[in-house]
Amino acid sequence: MEHLNFDMLYIAAAIMMGLAAIGAAIGIGILGSKFLEGAARQPDLIPILRTQFFIVMGLVDAIPMITVGLGLYVMFSAV
């Protein structure tokens, strides 16, 4: 019975990391489409939009990195 709990812990950590990666991919895709839409509407604002795009993309991409760290911590500290 004890092995079942560890198996569920590993599965939960894997699901947590996978869903975070999928969510970030969807978020960056939407962010990129909105950036291109804004750049097409107002080409003179491209430098400002690009700066904001990379800042927000870094924040969106940080969430899966934090989740991977937490998932690995949960997987390896529970043993």
UniProtKB/Swiss-Prot annotation:
One GO CC annotation: proton-transporting two-sector ATPase complex, proton-transporting domain
Record's bilayer topology term: Multi-pass membrane protein
Domain of life according to the entry: Bacteria
GO molecular function: lipid binding; proton-transporting ATP synthase activity, rotational mechanism
Keywords attached to this entry: ATP synthesis, Cell inner membrane, Cell membrane, CF(0), Hydrogen ion transport, Ion transport, Lipid-binding, Membrane, Transmembrane, Transmembrane helix, Transport
Subcellular location, record wording: Cell inner membrane
Site entry: Reversibly protonated during proton transport: D61
Coarse class of the protein's main subcellular location: membrane
Transmembrane residue ranges: 11-31, 53-73
Record-linked InterPro entries: ATP_synth_csu_bac/chlpt, ATP_synth_F0_csu, ATP_synth_F0_csu_DDCD_BS, ATP_synth_F0_csu_sf, ATPase_proteolipid_c-like_dom, F/V-ATP_Csub_sf
Family listed: Belongs to the ATPase C chain family.
Entries under HAMAP family matching the protein: ATP_synth_c_bact
Role noted for this protein: F(1)F(0) ATP synthase produces ATP from ADP in the presence of a proton or sodium gradient. F-type ATPases consist of two structural domains, F(1) containing the extramembraneous catalytic core and F(0) containing the membrane proton channel, linked together by a central stalk and a peripheral stalk. During catalysis, ATP synthesis in the catalytic domain of F(1) is coupled via a rotary mechanism of the central stalk subunits to proton translocation. Key component of the F(0) channel; it plays a direct role in translocation across the membrane. A homomeric c-ring of between 10-14 subunits forms the central stalk rotor element with the F(1) delta and epsilon subunits.
Subunit structure, as described in the record: F-type ATPases have 2 components, F(1) - the catalytic core - and F(0) - the membrane proton channel. F(1) has five subunits: alpha(3), beta(3), gamma(1), delta(1), epsilon(1). F(0) has three main subunits: a(1), b(2) and c(10-14). The alpha and beta chains form an alternating ring which encloses part of the gamma chain. F(1) is attached to F(0) by a central stalk formed by the gamma and epsilon chains, while a peripheral stalk is formed by the delta and b chains.
Protein name: ATP synthase subunit c
Protein encoded by which gene: atpE
